[in-house]
Amino acid sequence: MSKLQLRAVVADRRLDVEFSVSAGEVLAVLGPNGAGKSTALHVIAGLLRPDAGLVRLGDRVLTDTEAGVNVATHDRRVGLLLQDPLLFPHLSVAKNVAFGPQCRRGMFGSGRARTRASALRWLREVNAEQFADRKPRQLSGGQAQRVAIARALAAEPDVLLLDEPLTGLDVAAAAGIRSVLRSVVARSGCAVVLTTHDLLDVFTLADRVLVLESGTIAEIGPVADVLTAPRSRFGARIAGVNLVNGTIGPDGSLRTQSGAHWYGTPVQDLPTGHEAIAVFPPTAVAVYPEPPHGSPRNIVGLTVAEVDTRGPTVLVRGHDQPGGAPGLAACITVDAATELRVAPGSRVWFSVKAQEVALHPAPHQHASS
C-alpha cells in the first residue's frame, strides 16, 4: 500500500491545502459546511482538476498541474464512498460488488463463478453476504451502505475516501457501519480520508484529525491532541471547549481585542506580543449575577445568547466573540440555572480560575507529513 500526498489550490472554491496520509492511517477531516472537505476529496479522486497542485500515491503521480498530468478517475486506484451508496439499481448486490474489480482488471467476460466468488468474499467482510441476490431497492439504508463499502474495497484501492458515509443513517445502522469500517479498513491497509461532522466517527475510526476553515488547514494532529486542546474555532466548538484569541502581554496574560486579560498556564514559552489562544472547558466556568469577588483572576461579563439543558446540566453560552470565535460557554447545574434565572438576554459574569486555563500558541496554516 502507498502513502497519499495532496497539495491543491482551487481558487473558485477558496481551497488551499497540503497534507499526507500514510498507508493504513485514517485521517478525519472536520470543518463547517463550505470549508472545502468534499472539494479536497474530489481532487484526490480525479473528479475535479485543481488550479495548481499535486496528487501523489506512493511513486505514482495522479495529478501534477505543472507537468500536465491528470490520471483518469478509474485508473487512480482510489475508492470513493458518499452519503448516497449509488448502487446500480438494475444489478444484483453481488454484481454491484463485482463491478469494481471487473473494471480494474478487465475481467468482463471472465468466468461467472470467479467473479461471484470474489464478490461474495467482500460481502462476507461487511456482513452482507445474505443480500447477494437482492436488488438495491430491497435493501435498507444501512444494508445498502454495507454493499457500497464492499464494492469500494473489492477494487482493492490504495486510498479510500469516505465523504460523510454515515449521514442519514439511524443510530443502530450507523453503529453497525462504523464497526464494519473499523475492521475492514484495518485489514485493507489502505490510506483513508474521512469527512464527517460526528465526533463518534472520529473517536472510533480516526488516527489523526484535520480541521478545515474557509478552505485552509486550521489545525492537524492526533485525535486526542486536537479534541482535548483544540486551537481552531471549529475544533473548539465541536470539542465543546472555550477558546479566546489574543496576544501575550508583558505580564504573561492573553490580551484580547476588547482589552480583556486572560491569565492561565502556558503550554510552552510564549513571548510578549506572540499571538496565542486561551482554552478551557465550560465545566471550569462559574456563573454569577454580579461581578464576583475572590481568588479567580479571569472574570468577564456577557449577555446570554442561548441556554441548552443537557440532562442534569445546563449549557449557558454568550454571543459570538469579536472576530467570529464561538461565544463563551459555561456548564452549570439545573439548580444553579434556576437560581440565577438565566435566559437569553440575561446579563451574567463568567469566572474562571487561572489554573483551569491553558495558553497555546495561535494556530497558523500548515501542512502535514
From Swiss-Prot:
Free-text function comment from the UniProt entry: Part of the ABC transporter complex ModABC involved in molybdenum import. Responsible for energy coupling to the transport system.
InterPro entries: AAA+_ATPase, ABC_transporter-like_ATP-bd, ABC_transporter-like_CS, Mo/tungstate-bd_C_term_dom, Molybdenum_import_ModC, Mop_domain, P-loop_NTPase, Transp-assoc_OB_typ1
Top-level EC class: translocase
Domain of life: Bacteria
Organism: Mycobacterium tuberculosis (strain ATCC 25618 / H37Rv)
Sequence similarity: Belongs to the ABC transporter superfamily. Molybdate importer (TC 3.A.1.8) family.
EC number assigned by the record: 7.3.2.5
One of the record's GO cellular component terms: plasma membrane
Every Mop domain range: 293-361
Protein name listed in UniProt: Molybdenum import ATP-binding protein ModC
Subcellular location: Cell membrane
UniProt membrane topology term: Peripheral membrane protein
Subunit (UniProt): The complex is composed of two ATP-binding proteins (ModC), two transmembrane proteins (ModB) and a solute-binding protein (ModA).
Alphabetized Gene3D superfamilies for the sequence: 2.40.50.100, P-loop containing nucleotide triphosphate hydrolases
Residues in ABC transporter domain copies: 4-239
Keyword Translocase: yes
GO biological process, any: transmembrane transport
Catalytic activity: molybdate(out) + ATP + H2O = molybdate(in) + ADP + phosphate + H(+)
Binding residue positions for ATP: G31, P32, N33, G34, A35, G36, K37, S38
Any matching Pfam family: TOBE
Transmembrane segments: none
Keywords recorded for this protein, A-Z: ATP-binding, Cell membrane, Membrane, Molybdenum, Nucleotide-binding, Translocase, Transport
GO MF: ABC-type molybdate transporter activity; ATP binding; ATP hydrolysis activity; transmembrane transporter activity
